[in-house]
Amino acid sequence: MQPNDITFFQRFQDDILAGRKTITIRDESESHFKTGDVLRVGRFEDDGYFCTIEVTATSTVTLDTLTEKHAQQENMTLPELKKVIADIYPGQTQFYVIEFKCL
């Protein structure tokens, strides 16, 4: 079995598969992904594979420069997005946006 290249919390799986979540915001440890990369996607909780994505763009963002567009791409409100990011990455302010599409 091939290893997964990136994982998402299980609660995001349905939104990813339905095309409602089209970005992920990560810290520096996952800043190496590049446009055109094809990635196997698994669930964080059990590493179970659930789809393959293609990275369509990458950029940097800070907690303060997150926008409504980012929130829409995450299928959340802006306050929800800021809270999720702060909960996952406490004390961090610099992040990496990975835009993707399911293949």
UniProtKB/Swiss-Prot annotation:
Q: Its catalytic activity?
A: N(4)-acetylcytidine + H2O = cytidine + acetate + H(+); N(4)-acetyl-2'-deoxycytidine + H2O = 2'-deoxycytidine + acetate + H(+); N(4)-acetylcytosine + H2O = cytosine + acetate + H(+)
Q: Does the keyword Coiled coil apply?
A: no
| Residues covered by the ASCH domain | 6-101
Database matches in HAMAP family: ac4C_amidohydr
Role, per record:
Catalyzes the hydrolysis of N(4)-acetylcytidine (ac4C).
The superkingdom listed in its UniProt entry is Bacteria
Name of the protein described by the UniProt record: N(4)-acetylcytidine amidohydrolase
Protein's gene: yqfB
Q: Which organism is it from?
A: Escherichia fergusonii (strain ATCC 35469 / DSM 13698 / CCUG 18766 / IAM 14443 / JCM 21226 / LMG 7866 / NBRC 102419 / NCTC 12128 / CDC 0568-73)
